[in-house]
Protein backbone atom coordinates (compact mmCIF):
# COMPACT_ATOMS: atom_id res chain seq x y z
CA UNK A 1 0.00 0.00 0.00
CA UNK A 2 1.06 3.58 -0.61
CA UNK A 3 2.41 5.46 2.41
CA UNK A 4 -0.18 8.00 3.54
CA UNK A 5 2.52 10.67 3.60
CA UNK A 6 2.52 10.43 -0.19
CA UNK A 7 -1.21 11.08 -0.51
CA UNK A 8 -0.86 14.85 -1.09
CA UNK A 9 1.32 14.23 -4.15
CA UNK A 10 -1.28 11.98 -5.73
CA UNK A 11 -4.03 14.55 -5.58
CA UNK A 12 -5.44 15.84 -8.89
CA UNK A 13 -3.71 18.84 -10.40
CA UNK A 14 -6.59 21.19 -9.60
CA UNK A 15 -5.71 20.79 -5.92
CA UNK A 16 -2.94 23.31 -6.62
CA UNK A 17 -3.73 27.02 -6.38
CA UNK A 18 -4.47 28.67 -9.71
CA UNK A 19 -5.28 25.41 -11.54
CA UNK A 20 -8.95 25.57 -12.52
CA UNK A 21 -11.19 23.51 -14.81
CA UNK A 22 -9.82 25.17 -17.97
CA UNK A 23 -6.16 24.85 -17.10
CA UNK A 24 -6.34 21.35 -15.60
CA UNK A 25 -6.78 19.35 -18.87
CA UNK A 26 -4.09 21.41 -20.60
CA UNK A 27 -1.64 20.73 -17.78
CA UNK A 28 -2.57 17.03 -17.74
CA UNK A 29 -1.80 16.82 -21.45
CA UNK A 30 1.58 18.48 -20.92
CA UNK A 31 2.78 16.27 -18.05
CA UNK A 32 1.19 13.06 -19.33
CA UNK A 33 -0.72 12.39 -16.11
CA UNK A 34 -3.39 13.61 -13.74
CA UNK A 35 -1.59 14.05 -10.44
CA UNK A 36 0.70 16.51 -8.73
CA UNK A 37 3.38 13.81 -8.77
CA UNK A 38 3.22 13.73 -12.57
CA UNK A 39 3.78 17.49 -12.57
CA UNK A 40 6.87 17.20 -10.37
CA UNK A 41 8.33 14.68 -12.81
CA UNK A 42 7.97 17.19 -15.67
CA UNK A 43 11.56 18.37 -15.69
CA UNK A 44 12.87 21.69 -17.03
CA UNK A 45 14.87 21.40 -20.23
CA UNK A 46 17.24 24.21 -19.23
CA UNK A 47 17.79 26.94 -16.67
CA UNK A 48 18.15 30.66 -17.39
CA UNK A 49 20.59 32.74 -15.38
CA UNK A 50 18.66 35.87 -14.36
CA UNK A 51 21.11 37.19 -11.79
CA UNK A 52 21.21 41.02 -12.07
CA UNK A 53 24.08 42.73 -13.91
CA UNK A 54 25.82 45.62 -12.18
CA UNK A 55 25.48 48.00 -15.12
CA UNK A 56 24.51 48.28 -18.77
CA UNK A 57 28.23 48.18 -19.58
CA UNK A 58 28.18 44.43 -18.85
CA UNK A 59 25.52 43.64 -21.45
CA UNK A 60 26.33 41.17 -24.25
CA UNK A 61 24.28 40.74 -27.41
CA UNK A 62 22.05 37.64 -27.65
CA UNK A 63 22.30 36.87 -23.94
CA UNK A 64 19.51 36.99 -21.37
CA UNK A 65 20.21 39.73 -18.85
CA UNK A 66 18.59 41.25 -15.78
CA UNK A 67 19.31 44.95 -15.20
CA UNK A 68 18.09 47.88 -13.11
CA UNK A 69 17.59 51.39 -14.40
CA UNK A 70 15.60 54.60 -14.12
CA UNK A 71 12.83 55.31 -16.62
CA UNK A 72 14.12 58.18 -18.75
CA UNK A 73 11.42 58.39 -21.43
CA UNK A 74 8.47 56.58 -23.04
CA UNK A 75 8.35 57.34 -26.76
CA UNK A 76 5.18 56.70 -28.73
CA UNK A 77 5.50 54.95 -32.14
CA UNK A 78 5.78 57.18 -35.20
CA UNK A 79 3.61 54.83 -37.31
CA UNK A 80 1.45 51.72 -36.84
CA UNK A 81 4.30 49.30 -37.49
CA UNK A 82 6.84 51.01 -35.22
CA UNK A 83 7.24 50.00 -31.57
CA UNK A 84 6.74 52.03 -28.44
CA UNK A 85 10.18 52.65 -26.97
CA UNK A 86 10.99 52.89 -23.26
CA UNK A 87 14.41 54.29 -22.37
CA UNK A 88 16.11 53.17 -19.16
CA UNK A 89 19.23 54.87 -17.81
CA UNK A 90 21.58 53.45 -15.17
CA UNK A 91 24.34 56.06 -15.10
CA UNK A 92 26.54 54.18 -17.56
CA UNK A 93 24.27 54.33 -20.57
CA UNK A 94 20.84 53.66 -22.04
CA UNK A 95 18.83 50.49 -22.67
CA UNK A 96 15.83 50.69 -25.01
CA UNK A 97 12.84 48.50 -24.32
CA UNK A 98 10.69 47.95 -27.42
CA UNK A 99 7.00 47.03 -27.39
CA UNK A 100 5.10 46.35 -30.60
CA UNK A 101 1.35 47.01 -30.69
CA UNK A 102 1.30 47.72 -26.98
CA UNK A 103 -1.30 49.78 -25.12
CA UNK A 104 0.31 53.17 -24.58
CA UNK A 105 -1.60 53.92 -21.39
CA UNK A 106 -0.59 50.57 -19.92
CA UNK A 107 3.06 51.28 -20.70
CA UNK A 108 2.82 54.73 -19.12
CA UNK A 109 1.50 53.12 -15.94
CA UNK A 110 4.20 50.46 -15.97
CA UNK A 111 7.04 52.89 -16.64
CA UNK A 112 6.48 56.21 -14.82
CA UNK A 113 9.24 58.71 -15.61
CA UNK A 114 11.92 58.87 -12.94
CA UNK A 115 11.02 55.56 -11.31
CA UNK A 116 13.32 52.55 -11.12
CA UNK A 117 12.47 49.30 -12.81
CA UNK A 118 14.13 45.90 -12.99
CA UNK A 119 13.77 44.22 -16.38
CA UNK A 120 14.93 40.82 -17.62
CA UNK A 121 15.03 39.52 -21.18
CA UNK A 122 17.16 38.91 -24.25
CA UNK A 123 19.60 41.65 -25.24
CA UNK A 124 20.10 42.69 -28.86
CA UNK A 125 22.15 45.45 -30.45
CA UNK A 126 20.64 47.77 -33.07
CA UNK A 127 22.46 50.73 -34.60
CA UNK A 128 24.92 50.77 -31.72
CA UNK A 129 22.23 50.75 -29.02
CA UNK A 130 21.28 48.04 -26.54
CA UNK A 131 17.71 46.84 -26.91
CA UNK A 132 15.38 44.44 -25.12
CA UNK A 133 12.14 43.56 -26.91
CA UNK A 134 9.12 42.72 -24.74
CA UNK A 135 10.97 41.93 -21.50
CA UNK A 136 10.11 38.65 -19.77
CA UNK A 137 9.95 40.38 -16.40
CA UNK A 138 9.23 44.00 -15.39
CA UNK A 139 9.58 44.54 -11.63
CA UNK A 140 9.21 47.47 -9.23
CA UNK A 141 12.07 47.21 -6.70
CA UNK A 142 10.37 49.70 -4.37
CA UNK A 143 7.73 47.01 -3.76
CA UNK A 144 10.32 44.32 -3.14
CA UNK A 145 9.71 42.75 -6.55
CA UNK A 146 12.62 40.87 -8.09
CA UNK A 147 12.79 38.22 -10.83
CA UNK A 148 14.10 34.78 -9.90
CA UNK A 149 17.88 34.48 -9.90
CA UNK A 150 17.45 31.37 -12.03
CA UNK A 151 14.37 30.44 -14.05
CA UNK A 152 13.64 26.85 -15.04
CA UNK A 153 12.47 26.64 -18.66
CA UNK A 154 9.95 23.87 -19.29
CA UNK A 155 8.71 22.07 -22.39
CA UNK A 156 5.29 23.64 -23.03
CA UNK A 157 2.09 23.04 -24.93
CA UNK A 158 -0.49 25.43 -26.35
CA UNK A 159 -2.38 27.25 -23.61
CA UNK A 160 0.41 27.28 -21.03
CA UNK A 161 3.16 29.76 -20.25
CA UNK A 162 6.46 29.00 -18.60
CA UNK A 163 5.55 31.23 -15.66
CA UNK A 164 2.35 29.28 -15.04
CA UNK A 165 4.10 25.89 -15.10
CA UNK A 166 6.90 27.20 -12.88
CA UNK A 167 4.40 28.56 -10.36
CA UNK A 168 2.53 25.24 -10.29
CA UNK A 169 5.75 23.31 -9.70
CA UNK A 170 6.78 25.61 -6.86
CA UNK A 171 3.39 25.09 -5.23
CA UNK A 172 3.71 21.32 -5.69
CA UNK A 173 7.08 21.25 -3.93
CA UNK A 174 5.45 22.62 -0.79
CA UNK A 175 3.53 19.34 -0.52
CA UNK A 176 6.75 17.31 -0.28
CA UNK A 177 7.33 16.46 3.37
CA UNK A 178 10.87 17.27 4.48
CA UNK A 179 10.46 14.61 7.18
CA UNK A 180 10.25 11.75 4.71
CA UNK A 181 12.75 9.02 5.61
CA UNK A 182 15.73 8.87 3.26
CA UNK A 183 15.70 5.77 1.06
CA UNK A 184 19.19 6.19 -0.38
CA UNK A 185 22.10 4.78 1.57
CA UNK A 186 23.82 7.54 3.55
CA UNK A 187 27.28 6.59 2.29
CA UNK A 188 26.12 6.89 -1.34
CA UNK A 189 24.50 10.27 -0.67
CA UNK A 190 27.71 11.53 0.90
CA UNK A 191 29.96 10.11 -1.81
CA UNK A 192 27.90 11.69 -4.62
CA UNK A 193 27.15 14.92 -2.69
CA UNK A 194 23.46 14.49 -3.45
CA UNK A 195 20.77 16.55 -1.67
CA UNK A 196 17.66 15.15 0.01
CA UNK A 197 14.64 14.37 -2.17
CA UNK A 198 12.87 17.64 -1.35
CA UNK A 199 16.07 19.64 -1.79
CA UNK A 200 16.57 17.95 -5.16
CA UNK A 201 13.04 18.88 -6.27
CA UNK A 202 13.69 22.45 -5.17
CA UNK A 203 17.03 22.36 -6.93
CA UNK A 204 15.46 21.67 -10.31
CA UNK A 205 12.09 23.44 -10.03
CA UNK A 206 12.91 26.38 -7.75
CA UNK A 207 16.66 26.89 -7.32
CA UNK A 208 17.53 29.91 -5.20
CA UNK A 209 20.87 30.52 -6.87
CA UNK A 210 22.33 29.87 -10.30
CA UNK A 211 24.80 27.09 -9.55
CA UNK A 212 25.24 24.61 -12.39
CA UNK A 213 26.93 22.07 -10.13
CA UNK A 214 24.08 22.12 -7.61
CA UNK A 215 21.46 21.83 -10.34
CA UNK A 216 23.34 18.90 -11.85
CA UNK A 217 23.54 17.12 -8.49
CA UNK A 218 19.81 17.62 -7.95
CA UNK A 219 19.07 16.16 -11.38
CA UNK A 220 21.40 13.22 -10.73
CA UNK A 221 19.73 12.49 -7.40
CA UNK A 222 16.27 12.37 -8.99
CA UNK A 223 17.53 10.31 -11.93
CA UNK A 224 18.99 7.80 -9.50
CA UNK A 225 15.65 7.66 -7.68
CA UNK A 226 14.03 6.66 -10.97
CA UNK A 227 16.65 3.98 -11.61
CA UNK A 228 16.22 2.65 -8.08
CA UNK A 229 12.43 2.59 -8.38
CA UNK A 230 12.66 0.56 -11.58
CA UNK A 231 15.15 -1.85 -10.07
CA UNK A 232 12.87 -2.36 -7.04
CA UNK A 233 9.97 -3.06 -9.41
CA UNK A 234 12.05 -5.68 -11.19
CA UNK A 235 13.08 -7.17 -7.85
CA UNK A 236 9.45 -7.50 -6.77
CA UNK A 237 8.59 -9.11 -10.12
CA UNK A 238 11.40 -11.64 -9.67
CA UNK A 239 10.23 -12.42 -6.14
CA UNK A 240 6.61 -12.81 -7.27
CA UNK A 241 7.70 -15.17 -10.04
CA UNK A 242 9.58 -17.37 -7.60
CA UNK A 243 6.45 -17.58 -5.48
CA UNK A 244 4.34 -18.68 -8.47
CA UNK A 245 3.76 -22.33 -9.35
CA UNK A 246 4.82 -23.98 -12.61
CA UNK A 247 5.39 -27.49 -13.89
CA UNK A 248 8.89 -28.62 -12.98
CA UNK A 249 10.38 -30.26 -16.08
CA UNK A 250 13.20 -32.66 -15.14
CA UNK A 251 16.52 -32.48 -16.95
CA UNK A 252 16.75 -34.93 -19.86
CA UNK A 253 20.46 -35.36 -20.53
CA UNK A 254 20.11 -38.65 -22.41
CA UNK A 255 17.59 -37.16 -24.84
CA UNK A 256 19.74 -34.08 -25.37
CA UNK A 257 22.79 -36.24 -26.00
CA UNK A 258 20.85 -38.17 -28.65
CA UNK A 259 20.07 -34.88 -30.39
CA UNK A 260 23.70 -33.73 -30.17
CA UNK A 261 24.83 -37.03 -31.69
CA UNK A 262 22.81 -36.31 -34.85
CA UNK A 263 24.37 -32.90 -35.43
CA UNK A 264 27.03 -32.48 -38.13
CA UNK A 265 28.88 -30.06 -35.82
CA UNK A 266 29.60 -29.61 -32.14
CA UNK A 267 27.60 -27.04 -30.18
CA UNK A 268 29.64 -24.03 -29.09
CA UNK A 269 30.59 -23.56 -25.46
CA UNK A 270 28.17 -20.61 -25.36
CA UNK A 271 25.33 -22.87 -26.55
CA UNK A 272 26.23 -25.45 -23.93
CA UNK A 273 26.28 -22.80 -21.16
CA UNK A 274 22.92 -21.39 -22.24
CA UNK A 275 21.38 -24.87 -22.44
CA UNK A 276 22.56 -25.66 -18.91
CA UNK A 277 20.98 -22.42 -17.66
CA UNK A 278 17.68 -23.34 -19.30
CA UNK A 279 17.74 -26.96 -18.09
CA UNK A 280 18.22 -25.79 -14.52
CA UNK A 281 15.44 -23.20 -14.86
CA UNK A 282 12.99 -25.72 -16.29
CA UNK A 283 13.60 -28.13 -13.43
CA UNK A 284 12.39 -25.52 -10.92
CA UNK A 285 8.78 -25.41 -9.70
CA UNK A 286 8.40 -21.72 -10.55
CA UNK A 287 8.17 -20.30 -14.10
CA UNK A 288 11.36 -19.61 -16.01
CA UNK A 289 11.66 -16.14 -17.51
CA UNK A 290 14.92 -16.06 -19.45
CA UNK A 291 16.25 -14.09 -22.39
CA UNK A 292 18.64 -15.72 -24.83
CA UNK A 293 20.70 -13.04 -26.52
CA UNK A 294 22.78 -14.05 -29.47
CA UNK A 295 24.57 -12.37 -32.29
CA UNK A 296 23.38 -13.12 -35.82
CA UNK A 297 24.15 -16.73 -36.71
CA UNK A 298 25.04 -17.70 -33.14
CA UNK A 299 22.71 -20.72 -33.07
CA UNK A 300 19.75 -19.67 -30.93
CA UNK A 301 17.33 -22.08 -32.61
CA UNK A 302 19.43 -25.08 -31.58
CA UNK A 303 19.32 -23.95 -27.95
CA UNK A 304 15.56 -23.53 -28.29
CA UNK A 305 15.37 -27.07 -29.71
CA UNK A 306 17.20 -28.41 -26.65
CA UNK A 307 14.60 -26.70 -24.43
CA UNK A 308 11.77 -28.14 -26.54
CA UNK A 309 13.21 -31.65 -26.16
CA UNK A 310 13.33 -31.31 -22.38
CA UNK A 311 9.68 -30.20 -22.35
CA UNK A 312 8.56 -32.97 -24.71
CA UNK A 313 10.43 -35.66 -22.78
CA UNK A 314 8.67 -34.48 -19.63
CA UNK A 315 5.29 -35.03 -21.27
CA UNK A 316 4.64 -31.37 -22.04
CA UNK A 317 4.17 -29.22 -25.13
CA UNK A 318 6.41 -26.42 -26.41
CA UNK A 319 5.38 -23.49 -28.64
CA UNK A 320 7.80 -21.40 -30.72
CA UNK A 321 6.39 -18.02 -31.75
CA UNK A 322 7.95 -15.95 -34.57
CA UNK A 323 6.81 -12.52 -35.80
CA UNK A 324 6.32 -13.40 -39.49
CA UNK A 325 5.04 -16.24 -41.64
CA UNK A 326 8.45 -16.64 -43.31
CA UNK A 327 10.32 -16.91 -40.02
CA UNK A 328 7.75 -19.26 -38.49
CA UNK A 329 7.94 -21.66 -41.44
CA UNK A 330 11.73 -21.43 -41.54
CA UNK A 331 11.79 -22.19 -37.83
CA UNK A 332 9.47 -25.14 -38.40
CA UNK A 333 11.73 -26.49 -41.15
CA UNK A 334 14.74 -26.34 -38.82
CA UNK A 335 12.93 -27.97 -35.90
CA UNK A 336 11.41 -30.61 -38.15
CA UNK A 337 14.84 -31.54 -39.54
CA UNK A 338 16.37 -31.66 -36.06
CA UNK A 339 13.63 -33.35 -34.06
CA UNK A 340 11.29 -35.37 -36.28
CA UNK A 341 13.95 -38.05 -36.98
CA UNK A 342 14.16 -38.55 -33.21
CA UNK A 343 10.43 -39.23 -32.98
CA UNK A 344 9.12 -35.87 -31.82
CA UNK A 345 5.87 -34.59 -33.34
CA UNK A 346 6.56 -31.15 -34.80
CA UNK A 347 3.99 -28.95 -36.56
CA UNK A 348 3.37 -25.38 -37.69
CA UNK A 349 0.42 -22.99 -37.30
CA UNK A 350 0.13 -19.59 -38.97
CA UNK A 351 -2.70 -17.36 -40.08
CA UNK A 352 -2.39 -18.73 -43.58
CA UNK A 353 -3.23 -22.31 -42.59
CA UNK A 354 -6.82 -23.05 -43.57
CA UNK A 355 -9.30 -25.88 -43.84
CA UNK A 356 -8.44 -29.45 -42.94
CA UNK A 357 -4.75 -28.68 -42.39
CA UNK A 358 -5.60 -26.10 -39.74
CA UNK A 359 -8.23 -28.33 -38.14
CA UNK A 360 -5.77 -31.20 -37.87
CA UNK A 361 -3.17 -28.96 -36.24
CA UNK A 362 -5.67 -27.54 -33.75
CA UNK A 363 -6.80 -31.04 -32.84
CA UNK A 364 -3.21 -32.22 -32.40
CA UNK A 365 -2.46 -29.33 -30.06
CA UNK A 366 -5.63 -29.89 -28.06
CA UNK A 367 -5.15 -33.64 -27.60
CA UNK A 368 -1.38 -33.49 -27.12
CA UNK A 369 -0.41 -35.41 -30.25
CA UNK A 370 1.65 -32.40 -31.37
CA UNK A 371 4.52 -31.91 -28.94
CA UNK A 372 6.29 -28.95 -30.55
CA UNK A 373 4.68 -26.26 -32.70
CA UNK A 374 6.14 -23.26 -34.51
CA UNK A 375 3.85 -20.41 -35.45
CA UNK A 376 2.97 -16.75 -35.56
CA UNK A 377 0.38 -14.69 -33.68
CA UNK A 378 -2.05 -17.43 -34.73
CA UNK A 379 -0.82 -19.47 -31.76
CA UNK A 380 -2.60 -17.30 -29.20
CA UNK A 381 -5.84 -16.64 -31.06
CA UNK A 382 -9.24 -17.79 -29.81
CA UNK A 383 -9.92 -21.38 -30.74
CA UNK A 384 -6.33 -22.50 -30.15
CA UNK A 385 -5.90 -24.69 -27.08
CA UNK A 386 -3.08 -26.87 -25.80
CA UNK A 387 -3.36 -30.02 -23.76
CA UNK A 388 -0.33 -29.30 -21.63
CA UNK A 389 1.68 -26.25 -22.70
CA UNK A 390 4.68 -25.88 -20.39
CA UNK A 391 7.25 -24.10 -22.56
CA UNK A 392 6.91 -20.93 -24.63
CA UNK A 393 9.77 -19.71 -26.83
CA UNK A 394 9.43 -16.29 -28.43
CA UNK A 395 11.84 -15.60 -31.30
CA UNK A 396 12.78 -12.06 -32.37
CA UNK A 397 11.10 -11.02 -29.15
CA UNK A 398 11.59 -7.29 -29.77
CA UNK A 399 8.93 -7.57 -32.50
CA UNK A 400 6.29 -8.49 -29.91
CA UNK A 401 4.63 -6.49 -27.17
CA UNK A 402 4.26 -7.75 -23.62
CA UNK A 403 0.54 -8.35 -24.27
CA UNK A 404 1.34 -10.75 -27.14
CA UNK A 405 3.64 -12.82 -24.97
CA UNK A 406 1.12 -12.89 -22.14
CA UNK A 407 -1.63 -14.13 -24.48
CA UNK A 408 0.48 -17.11 -25.49
CA UNK A 409 1.45 -17.80 -21.88
CA UNK A 410 -2.25 -17.81 -20.96
CA UNK A 411 -2.65 -20.93 -23.12
CA UNK A 412 -0.85 -22.95 -20.44
CA UNK A 413 -0.61 -23.25 -16.67
CA UNK A 414 2.03 -20.66 -15.90
CA UNK A 415 4.40 -22.04 -18.57
CA UNK A 416 8.11 -21.42 -18.67
CA UNK A 417 9.15 -18.73 -21.16
CA UNK A 418 12.33 -18.23 -23.15
CA UNK A 419 12.59 -15.10 -25.27
CA UNK A 420 15.25 -15.00 -27.98
CA UNK A 421 16.76 -11.94 -29.59
CA UNK A 422 19.17 -11.69 -32.51
CA UNK A 423 19.57 -8.01 -31.74
CA UNK A 424 22.36 -7.73 -29.15
CA UNK A 425 21.33 -5.31 -26.43
CA UNK A 426 23.86 -3.27 -24.43
CA UNK A 427 24.09 -4.35 -20.81
CA UNK A 428 22.66 -1.10 -19.45
CA UNK A 429 19.71 -1.25 -21.81
CA UNK A 430 19.06 -4.88 -20.94
CA UNK A 431 19.00 -3.94 -17.25
CA UNK A 432 16.56 -1.12 -18.01
CA UNK A 433 14.07 -3.10 -20.08
CA UNK A 434 14.57 -6.73 -19.11
CA UNK A 435 15.58 -6.46 -15.48
CA UNK A 436 12.93 -9.02 -14.55
CA UNK A 437 14.53 -11.63 -16.82
CA UNK A 438 17.56 -13.85 -16.38
CA UNK A 439 19.89 -13.49 -19.36
CA UNK A 440 22.02 -15.99 -21.26
CA UNK A 441 24.36 -14.80 -23.99
CA UNK A 442 25.59 -16.58 -27.12
CA UNK A 443 28.83 -14.81 -27.94
CA UNK A 444 30.34 -17.47 -30.23
CA UNK A 445 29.50 -18.52 -33.76
CA UNK A 446 29.33 -22.20 -34.76
CA UNK A 447 32.46 -23.71 -36.28
CA UNK A 448 32.76 -23.32 -40.03
CA UNK A 449 31.12 -19.92 -40.24
CA UNK A 450 33.18 -17.59 -42.42
CA UNK A 451 33.90 -13.98 -41.45
CA UNK A 452 32.19 -11.38 -43.60
CA UNK A 453 34.50 -8.82 -45.20
CA UNK A 454 32.81 -5.41 -45.15
CA UNK A 455 33.65 -2.68 -47.64
CA UNK A 456 32.43 0.92 -47.63
CA UNK A 457 32.11 2.25 -51.19
CA UNK A 458 30.68 5.45 -52.69
CA UNK A 459 27.65 4.82 -54.92
CA UNK A 460 29.50 6.48 -57.81
CA UNK A 461 31.26 3.10 -58.12
CA UNK A 462 28.06 1.08 -58.38
CA UNK A 463 29.05 -0.27 -61.81
CA UNK A 464 32.09 -1.94 -60.24
CA UNK A 465 29.85 -3.51 -57.59
CA UNK A 466 27.43 -4.84 -60.23
CA UNK A 467 30.37 -6.38 -62.10
CA UNK A 468 31.60 -8.09 -58.92
CA UNK A 469 28.10 -9.44 -58.22
CA UNK A 470 27.95 -10.79 -61.77
CA UNK A 471 31.21 -12.70 -61.25
CA UNK A 472 29.80 -14.23 -58.04
CA UNK A 473 26.68 -15.39 -59.86
CA UNK A 474 28.89 -17.11 -62.44
CA UNK A 475 30.37 -19.09 -59.53
CA UNK A 476 26.82 -20.21 -58.59
CA UNK A 477 26.78 -17.97 -55.54
CA UNK A 478 23.82 -15.81 -54.54
CA UNK A 479 23.49 -12.17 -53.56
CA UNK A 480 21.16 -9.92 -51.59
CA UNK A 481 20.73 -6.33 -52.76
CA UNK A 482 18.99 -4.12 -50.19
CA UNK A 483 17.37 -0.80 -51.10
CA UNK A 484 16.03 1.83 -48.69
CA UNK A 485 12.60 2.19 -50.31
CA UNK A 486 10.22 0.30 -52.55
CA UNK A 487 9.86 2.76 -55.41
CA UNK A 488 10.38 6.42 -56.16
CA UNK A 489 10.14 8.23 -59.47
CA UNK A 490 13.29 10.24 -58.87
CA UNK A 491 15.43 7.63 -57.10
CA UNK A 492 17.24 4.82 -58.90
CA UNK A 493 18.14 3.28 -55.52
CA UNK A 494 14.55 2.12 -55.01
CA UNK A 495 13.99 -1.63 -55.01
CA UNK A 496 11.79 -1.67 -58.10
CA UNK A 497 14.21 0.42 -60.17
CA UNK A 498 17.28 -1.49 -58.98
CA UNK A 499 15.72 -4.88 -59.75
CA UNK A 500 14.96 -3.76 -63.31
CA UNK A 501 18.50 -2.42 -63.76
CA UNK A 502 20.11 -5.63 -62.48
CA UNK A 503 17.96 -7.79 -64.76
CA UNK A 504 19.15 -5.78 -67.75
CA UNK A 505 22.83 -5.71 -66.80
CA UNK A 506 23.24 -9.24 -65.44
CA UNK A 507 20.86 -11.02 -67.80
CA UNK A 508 19.70 -13.05 -64.84
CA UNK A 509 16.44 -13.74 -63.02
CA UNK A 510 16.20 -11.22 -60.20
CA UNK A 511 13.81 -11.72 -57.31
CA UNK A 512 12.07 -8.81 -55.60
CA UNK A 513 10.58 -8.69 -52.11
CA UNK A 514 9.25 -5.70 -50.17
CA UNK A 515 6.71 -4.80 -47.52
CA UNK A 516 3.90 -3.89 -49.92
CA UNK A 517 3.72 -7.39 -51.36
CA UNK A 518 1.17 -9.90 -50.14
CA UNK A 519 2.45 -12.56 -47.80
CA UNK A 520 2.19 -15.29 -50.41
CA UNK A 521 4.18 -13.21 -52.90
CA UNK A 522 6.94 -12.53 -50.38
CA UNK A 523 7.12 -16.18 -49.43
CA UNK A 524 7.35 -17.23 -53.08
CA UNK A 525 10.15 -14.74 -53.80
CA UNK A 526 12.13 -15.84 -50.74
CA UNK A 527 11.59 -19.52 -51.52
CA UNK A 528 12.76 -19.02 -55.12
CA UNK A 529 15.93 -17.38 -53.82
CA UNK A 530 16.47 -20.03 -51.16
CA UNK A 531 16.18 -22.88 -53.68
CA UNK A 532 18.34 -21.15 -56.30
CA UNK A 533 15.64 -20.41 -58.87
CA UNK A 534 16.81 -16.81 -58.59
CA UNK A 535 20.41 -15.98 -57.74
CA UNK A 536 19.93 -12.39 -56.73
CA UNK A 537 17.25 -10.98 -54.45
CA UNK A 538 16.51 -7.26 -54.37
CA UNK A 539 14.72 -6.36 -51.16
CA UNK A 540 13.89 -3.72 -48.64
CA UNK A 541 14.63 -4.36 -44.97
CA UNK A 542 11.94 -7.05 -44.76
CA UNK A 543 14.83 -9.54 -44.96
CA UNK A 544 16.53 -7.96 -41.93
CA UNK A 545 16.16 -10.96 -39.63
CA UNK A 546 15.78 -14.69 -39.82
CA UNK A 547 16.23 -15.36 -43.55
CA UNK A 548 18.73 -18.22 -43.78
CA UNK A 549 20.29 -18.90 -47.20
CA UNK A 550 23.76 -20.46 -46.72
CA UNK A 551 24.57 -20.08 -50.45
CA UNK A 552 24.27 -16.27 -50.25
CA UNK A 553 27.76 -14.73 -50.15
CA UNK A 554 27.19 -11.07 -51.05
CA UNK A 555 25.11 -8.42 -49.32
CA UNK A 556 24.89 -5.02 -51.02
CA UNK A 557 23.17 -2.25 -49.04
CA UNK A 558 22.39 0.98 -50.89
CA UNK A 559 22.21 4.36 -49.15
CA UNK A 560 23.70 2.64 -46.13
CA UNK A 561 24.33 5.99 -44.47
CA UNK A 562 20.61 6.17 -43.69
CA UNK A 563 20.46 2.94 -41.68
CA UNK A 564 21.25 2.41 -38.01
CA UNK A 565 24.20 0.32 -36.91
CA UNK A 566 22.10 -2.49 -35.48
CA UNK A 567 20.00 -2.71 -38.63
CA UNK A 568 23.07 -2.79 -40.88
CA UNK A 569 24.55 -5.53 -38.72
CA UNK A 570 21.36 -7.59 -38.96
CA UNK A 571 21.30 -7.22 -42.74
CA UNK A 572 24.95 -8.20 -42.98
CA UNK A 573 24.10 -11.28 -40.93
CA UNK A 574 22.14 -12.71 -43.86
CA UNK A 575 25.46 -13.72 -45.46
CA UNK A 576 28.43 -15.63 -44.09
CA UNK A 577 26.22 -18.59 -43.14
CA UNK A 578 27.96 -21.11 -45.39
CA UNK A 579 31.51 -22.28 -45.95
CA UNK A 580 32.42 -19.74 -48.67
CA UNK A 581 34.00 -16.32 -48.16
CA UNK A 582 31.34 -13.63 -47.93
CA UNK A 583 31.23 -9.89 -48.49
CA UNK A 584 29.07 -6.97 -47.41
CA UNK A 585 29.18 -3.81 -49.54
CA UNK A 586 27.94 -0.62 -47.89
CA UNK A 587 27.14 1.81 -50.70
CA UNK A 588 26.83 5.41 -49.54
CA UNK A 589 25.96 8.70 -51.15
CA UNK A 590 28.35 11.55 -50.41
CA UNK A 591 28.72 13.74 -48.48
CA UNK A 592 28.60 11.73 -45.26
CA UNK A 593 27.77 13.30 -41.92
CA UNK A 594 30.24 12.66 -39.12
CA UNK A 595 27.78 10.31 -37.40
CA UNK A 596 27.12 8.35 -40.59
CA UNK A 597 30.85 8.02 -41.23
CA UNK A 598 31.36 6.73 -37.69
CA UNK A 599 28.57 4.16 -38.13
CA UNK A 600 29.98 2.80 -41.38
CA UNK A 601 33.52 2.72 -40.01
CA UNK A 602 32.28 0.69 -37.03
CA UNK A 603 30.64 -1.85 -39.36
CA UNK A 604 33.78 -2.10 -41.44
CA UNK A 605 35.94 -2.60 -38.36
CA UNK A 606 34.03 -5.27 -36.43
CA UNK A 607 31.51 -8.11 -36.72
CA UNK A 608 30.93 -8.27 -32.96
CA UNK A 609 27.23 -7.56 -32.52
CA UNK A 610 27.61 -6.61 -28.87
CA UNK A 611 30.33 -4.08 -29.64
CA UNK A 612 28.15 -2.71 -32.45
CA UNK A 613 25.13 -2.48 -30.15
CA UNK A 614 27.13 -0.48 -27.59
CA UNK A 615 28.31 1.88 -30.34
CA UNK A 616 24.76 2.33 -31.66
CA UNK A 617 23.51 2.97 -28.12
CA UNK A 618 26.06 5.74 -27.67
CA UNK A 619 25.37 7.25 -31.08
CA UNK A 620 21.60 7.15 -31.17
CA UNK A 621 20.28 6.21 -27.75
CA UNK A 622 17.95 3.36 -26.79
CA UNK A 623 15.02 3.89 -29.16
CA UNK A 624 16.62 2.52 -32.30
CA UNK A 625 17.83 -0.65 -30.61
CA UNK A 626 14.36 -1.70 -29.50
CA UNK A 627 11.25 -2.48 -31.41
CA UNK A 628 8.30 -0.10 -31.10
CA UNK A 629 6.56 -2.63 -28.91
CA UNK A 630 9.29 -2.29 -26.30
CA UNK A 631 10.86 1.12 -26.69
CA UNK A 632 8.34 2.55 -24.25
CA UNK A 633 9.81 0.27 -21.62
CA UNK A 634 12.97 2.35 -21.49
CA UNK A 635 11.18 5.68 -21.66
CA UNK A 636 12.78 7.18 -18.59
CA UNK A 637 11.50 10.59 -17.55
CA UNK A 638 14.53 11.66 -15.56
CA UNK A 639 17.43 9.49 -16.71
CA UNK A 640 19.27 10.48 -19.86
CA UNK A 641 20.69 7.47 -21.70
CA UNK A 642 23.38 6.61 -22.43
CA UNK A 643 24.98 9.51 -20.52
CA UNK A 644 23.66 8.40 -17.11
CA UNK A 645 24.06 4.65 -17.57
CA UNK A 646 26.23 4.55 -14.46
CA UNK A 647 23.18 5.38 -12.30
CA UNK A 648 21.45 2.21 -13.49
CA UNK A 649 24.56 0.20 -12.65
CA UNK A 650 24.61 1.65 -9.12
CA UNK A 651 20.89 1.02 -8.57
CA UNK A 652 21.13 -2.61 -9.68
CA UNK A 653 23.81 -3.50 -7.11
Question: Residue locations for each model-derived region?
Answer:
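Conserved pre-motif I regulatory segment
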Residues: 25-26, 31, 244-292
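Short boundary/loop segments of OB/S1/cold-shock single-stranded nucleic-acid-binding domains
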Residues: 45-65
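Structural detector for short beta-strands of small beta-barrel domains
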Residues: 61-82, 121
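Extended, structured, electrostatic nucleic-acid-contact surfaces
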Residues: 1-17, 25-26
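Upstream accessory/linker segments immediately N-terminal to the RecA-like ATPase cores of bacterial MutS
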Residues: 77-262
